[in-house]
């Protein structure tokens, strides 16, 4: 009994520390803060501002008053130094530091972007930097803070890389503050944890967010990397709005399908004399705890944005409380930087009869599946062919090798090409430049995607933007968001031919239901989607339909019309402009929520800091 009381007391004390003591420590500087800062500003030579453990509250005051907030990064070290320009400004700088009322029109807002791998240069970073740009464009008073673990890269290097790789130009660098996280960065890396990886990463996310808050507490928390455990302390301590941009849910209901005990009602099957059942029970408890913790974390998100319909559908099943709580759950397609591709594209130029596949050389991209079915297509329809002709297409695999595993996959594919005697008909383009990628997009007739359940698929968007007609696997992003989809229940969902491209399926698909295939035409596979039964061709059968059975489907005039439709669709849905417009709307909503949270959830003293 006493033990239970002690546990309850410990939980209560911890909760009060997190919800009352910690926010006071993070947000409110010491009583003599103005005198401390004034002393350093007026000191005849540069000295550090000694603030003890209250770096967050002091850094907030400096950033919110400074003409150059970016100066207050902690790249060199965590010590606080005042900008020479701010010292020169003297009394003007000190006056700007005055506490601001909630409705003060001069009050600035700090948007904290929690993205530890801000310098990595992938699709997630494209979203981050376009979101930062849009946030700065939304209001001159907005300041963006980037929480990163890329301690090897200086702020200007990171910004230059974003500009070069994603064409993020015109950023007001003075309003972008980098906060470097050094203590717990390894804890969010899956390779760090030998066992219980997910729970370890969640724990790491909590500690990393605490470090971020300790260095600088923002007014709005934005997670663009998918680290949901960061929402816990942010919501409890800072009491600020949270926006989460989710590329891929870390947990899904489908995961329980691999367990022996999938629901509570399945526990009646438990056999007390079977050791394996104890192990299975442990897995069920482990995944259930994680799953409902993820559900709880989702309920803390005010605006949850999914990168596409596939992710949105899964989040809708998991974050079930969001709608009931009045929170937003919506789709915001990532900015794909397609303006350049569209602007320079000549849709009327002649194209080579080639199938281009832009993808890293990884097993899940399923290059081997394409090779096997392409080989079958040739042997069944063009037996003993030795020369390239216009009667059938050739393959181009263009991609990069980032790891030793990627290199091994590439070597295997090259061996398969030799084994299948396809060397004349398959071309590999490895680690090519972006200019070479654009040249391929401009010259190849079709673009391929064979991945099962690719949640988005930016490569397909690039095909569409440059006029490379998509031939893609009918699943997830390419199916639900891209090729010929205007209405979720219609158009692309009832035919393998659409106004923007073509679909195929595979007998190797994990969601294949053998019971549906009994009366299906040879070469076609039946799938159920949104309560409809649809017959999709295999890749081999699709090529036969296009090149043997009815080549008029892909005559130049029809492909030109498809290219025009695809390009318009890209401009409307996947451009940077489309992203900016919707993002700024959400930023305005967050601005309103930030005022509301200050007024309703904070103490009178915390409100003005």
Curated annotation (Swiss-Prot):
EC main group: transferase
InterPro entries: ALG11, ALG11_N, Glyco_trans_1
Gene Ontology terms for molecular function: GDP-Man:Man3GlcNAc2-PP-Dol alpha-1,2-mannosyltransferase activity
Glycosyltransferase is among the record's keywords: yes
Biological or metabolic pathway of the protein: Protein modification; protein glycosylation
Bilayer-crossing regions: 2-22
Record's catalysed reaction(s): an alpha-D-Man-(1->3)-[alpha-D-Man-(1->6)]-beta-D-Man-(1->4)-beta-D-GlcNAc-(1->4)-alpha-D-GlcNAc-diphospho-di-trans,poly-cis-dolichol + 2 GDP-alpha-D-mannose = an alpha-D-Man-(1->2)-alpha-D-Man-(1->2)-alpha-D-Man-(1->3)-[alpha-D-Man-(1->6)]-beta-D-Man-(1->4)-beta-D-GlcNAc-(1->4)-alpha-D-GlcNAc-diphospho-di-trans,poly-cis-dolichol + 2 GDP + 2 H(+)
Membrane topology (Cytoplasmic): 23-195, 217-455, 477-609
GO cellular component, one term: endoplasmic reticulum membrane
Protein's membrane topology: Single-pass membrane protein
Locations listed in the record: Endoplasmic reticulum membrane
Biological role: GDP-Man:Man(3)GlcNAc(2)-PP-Dol alpha-1,2-mannosyltransferase that operates in the biosynthetic pathway of dolichol-linked oligosaccharides, the glycan precursors employed in protein asparagine (N)-glycosylation. The assembly of dolichol-linked oligosaccharides begins on the cytosolic side of the endoplasmic reticulum membrane and finishes in its lumen. The sequential addition of sugars to dolichol pyrophosphate produces dolichol-linked oligosaccharides containing fourteen sugars, including two GlcNAcs, nine mannoses and three glucoses.
Name this protein carries in UniProt: GDP-Man:Man(3)GlcNAc(2)-PP-Dol alpha-1,2-mannosyltransferase
Source species of the chain: Candida albicans (strain SC5314 / ATCC MYA-2876)
Recorded name of the encoding gene: ALG11
């Amino acid at each position: 009994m006493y033990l239970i009381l002690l546990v309850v007391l410990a939980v209560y004390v911890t909760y009060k520390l997190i919800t009352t003591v910690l926010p006071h420590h993070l947000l409110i500087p010491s009583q003599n803060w103005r005198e401390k800062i004034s002393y350093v500003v007026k000191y005849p030579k540069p000295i550090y501002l000694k603030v003890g453990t209250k770096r967050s509250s002091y850094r907030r005051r400096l950033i919110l008053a400074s003409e150059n907030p970016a100066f207050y990064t902690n790249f060199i070290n965590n010590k606080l130094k005042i900008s020479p320009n701010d010292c020169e400004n003297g009394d003007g700088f000190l006056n700007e530091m005055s506490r601001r009322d909630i409705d003060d029109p001069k009050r600035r807002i700090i948007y904290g972007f929690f993205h530890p791998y801000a310098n990595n240069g992938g699709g997630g970073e494209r979203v981050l930097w376009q979101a930062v740009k849009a946030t700065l464009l939304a209001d001159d008073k907005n300041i963006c803070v980037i929480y990163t673990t890329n301690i090897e890269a200086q702020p200007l290097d990171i910004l230059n890389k974003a500009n070069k790789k994603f064409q993020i130009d015109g950023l007001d660098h003075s309003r972008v503050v980098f906060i470097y996280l050094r203590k717990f960065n390894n804890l969010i890396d899956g390779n760090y944890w030998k066992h219980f990886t997910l729970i370890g990463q969640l724990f790491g996310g909590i500690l990393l967010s605490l470090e971020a808050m300790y260095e600088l507490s923002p007014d709005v928390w934005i997670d663009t990397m998918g680290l949901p455990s960061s929402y816990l302390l942010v919501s409890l301590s800072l009491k600020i709005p949270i926006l989460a941009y989710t590329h891929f849910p870390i947990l899904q209901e489908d995961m329980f399908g691999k367990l022996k005990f999938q629901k509570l009602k399945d526990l009646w099957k438990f056999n007390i004399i079977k050791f394996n059942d104890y192990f299975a029970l442990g897995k069920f408890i482990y995944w259930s705890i994680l799953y409902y913790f993820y559900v709880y974390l989702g309920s803390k998100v005010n605006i949850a944005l999914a990168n596409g319909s596939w992710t949105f559908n899964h989040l809708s099943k998991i974050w079930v409380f969001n709608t009931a709580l009045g929170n937003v759950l919506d789709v915001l397609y990532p900015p794909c930087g397609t303006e350049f591709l569209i602007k320079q594209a000549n849709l009327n130029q002649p194209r080579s009869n080639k199938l281009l596949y832009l993808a890293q050389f990884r097993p899940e991209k399923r290059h081997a599946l394409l090779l096997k079915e392409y080989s079958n297509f040739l042997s069944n329809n063009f037996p003993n062919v030795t020369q390239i002709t216009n009667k059938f297409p050739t393959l181009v695999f263009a991609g990069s090798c980032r790891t030793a595993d990627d290199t091994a996959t590439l070597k295997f594919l090259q061996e398969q090409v030799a084994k299948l005697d396809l060397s004349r008909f398959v071309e590999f383009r490895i680690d090519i430049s972006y200019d070479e990628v654009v040249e391929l997009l401009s010259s190849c007739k079709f673009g391929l995607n064979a991945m099962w359940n690719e949640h988005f698929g930016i490569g397909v968007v690039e095909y569409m933007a440059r006029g490379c007609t998509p031939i893609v696997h009918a699943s997830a992003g390419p199916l639900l968001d891209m090729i010929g989809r205007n209405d979720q229940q219609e158009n692309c969902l009832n035919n393998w031919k659409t106004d923007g491209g073509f679909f195929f399926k595979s007998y190797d698909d994990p969601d294949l239901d053998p019971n549906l295939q009994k009366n299906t035409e040879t070469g076609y596979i039946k799938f159920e989607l949104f309560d409809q039964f649809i017959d999709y061709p295999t890749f081999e059968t699709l090529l036969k339909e296009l090149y043997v059975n009815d080549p008029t489907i892909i005559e130049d005039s029809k492909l030109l019309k498809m290219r025009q439709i695809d390009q318009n669709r890209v401009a409307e849905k996947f451009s940077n402009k489309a992203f900016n417009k919707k993002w700024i709307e959400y930023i305005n909503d967050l601005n309103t929520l930030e005022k509301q949270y200050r007024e309703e959830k904070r103490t009178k003293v915390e409100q003005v800091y």
